């Protein structure tokens, strides 16, 4: 069987792509990503797990805004040398483009934090680069992933989603009329984490026909994707079997870095606890026991803000701490988890720590055979930015059934 020819834009470390590869139905012709650390990991994953002998060439580290060079090739001080995307696609007919621009400019939380509401952020218009690639290669379909906040983002005088809908329609693609229906709650697909994303499917009206495109898009959201819902998973389903990491009571060194907790036994890749201060360990124990013993003294925002001030001497407008509950999906795994992890405290008081890279990856549904390489900062960031592969696989299966099965 000939595989579905796909390219992945804004690929990150490949969460979206990994789910598609797991089905065995798709071939990744190219993946485009501008950050070095995700590219490094993506190349390793494509070669070691998915057995692409030419992974080095298929992963293009480049700035997608330089679209013409992306197509034709470049020789660049920062990004090195490549023959470009058109060379990789060659004579293949492209079936599918997947990916989504960075979501920070559309994120409601990001807009609240930024004094200008992210109106001046260049990332508001990265969808235009995605669109240029779609227009150039005319795939039968595309999947555009982003945060639900994109529906309300308005950097100029019009909502960004109106511009996106209009420009993709002008390019000859059919999208769902009411994109609120395109918001998907990933907990409904077995992802053990409270994470919702907008998944925009676009179909080439010239290829499928005007009326059939509309029917297929509606069928995708109303029938095909919902038919693949899975039982809900809790955080403990994902991380409960990992080796326990206990406070040592003193600092030690491991690989030249300071550690405050025991190493995993048996060893598990990427499962090393961050160094925690004695003060933080004490706070974590207090918060974890508060839940374990059903006291719930520190559930309210005010109580948590008061505790933070009492323990650190500083004031905060937002509460800093959150303990992951064993019997619920975890809170969102964000890209900024690399900063401190205080909102992702492990549920067990005996461990008194924030979650590890491997636990974040498990909550994002990456398989343990995806071994991440880089600093904690790089790894937490790329994992937090990813689409959970468990959902990606379901998405890939749904698209295959709807669009590609009879090809």
For each feature predicted by the language model, list its residue ranges.
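Class I S-adenosyl-L-methionine
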Residues: 75-79, 84-91, 106-309
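Short alpha-helical patches at coil-to-helix transitions and adjacent helical residues
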Residues: 13, 161, 197, 385-389, ...
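Short, flexible loop/turn elements at secondary-structure junctions
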Residues: 10, 36, 64, 101-102, ...
């Amino acid at each position: 069987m000939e595989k579905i020819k796909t390219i992945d834009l804004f690929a990150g470390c490949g969460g979206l792509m990994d789910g598609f590869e797991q089905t065995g139905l798709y071939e990744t012709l190219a993946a485009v990503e501008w950050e070095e650390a995700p590219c490094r990991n993506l190349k390793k994953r494509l070669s070691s797990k998915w057995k692409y002998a030419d992974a080095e060439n298929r992963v293009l580290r480049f700035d997608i805004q330089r679209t013409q060079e992306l197509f034709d090739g470049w020789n660049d001080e920062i990004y090195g040398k490549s023959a470009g995307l058109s060379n990789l696609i060659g004579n293949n007919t492209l079936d599918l483009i997947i990916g989504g621009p960075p979501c920070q400019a559309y994120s409601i939380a990001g807009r609240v934090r930024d004094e200008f509401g992210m109106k001046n952020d260049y990332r508001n218009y990265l969808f235009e680069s995605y669109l240029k690639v779609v227009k150039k290669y005319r795939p039968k379909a595309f999947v555009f992933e982003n945060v639900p906040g994109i529906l309300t983002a308005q950097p100029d005088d019009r909502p960004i989603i109106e511009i996106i809908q209009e420009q993709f329609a002008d390019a000859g693609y059919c999208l769902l009329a009411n994109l609120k229906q395109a918001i998907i709650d990933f907990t409904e697909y077995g992802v053990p984490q409270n994470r919702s994303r907008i998944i925009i499917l676009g179909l080439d009206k010239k290829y499928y026909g005007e009326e059939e495109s509309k029917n297929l898009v509606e069928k995708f959201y109303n029938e095909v994707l919902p038919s693949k819902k899975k039982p809900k998973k809790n955080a403990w389903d994902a991380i409960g079997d990992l080796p326990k990491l206990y406070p040592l009571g003193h600092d030690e060194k491991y690989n030249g870095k300071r550690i405050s907790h025991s190493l995993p036994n048996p060893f598990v890749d990427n499962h090393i606890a961050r160094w925690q201060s004695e003060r933080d360990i004490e706070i974590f124990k207090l918060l974890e026991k508060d839940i374990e013993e059903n006291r719930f003294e520190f559930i309210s925002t005010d109580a948590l803000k008061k505790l933070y001030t009492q323990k650190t001497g500083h004031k905060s407008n937002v509460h800093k701490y959150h303990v992951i509950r064993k019997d619920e999906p975890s809170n969102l795994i964000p890209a900024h988890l690399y900063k401190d992890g205080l909102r992702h405290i492990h549920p067990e008081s005996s461990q008194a720590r924030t979650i590890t890279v491997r636990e974040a990856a498990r909550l994002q549904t990456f398989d343990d055979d995806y071994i991440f390489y880089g600093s904690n900062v790089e790894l937490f960031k790329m994992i937090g930015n990813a689409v959970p592969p468990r959902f990606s696989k379901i998405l890939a299966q749904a698209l295959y059934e709807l669009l590609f099965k009879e090809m």
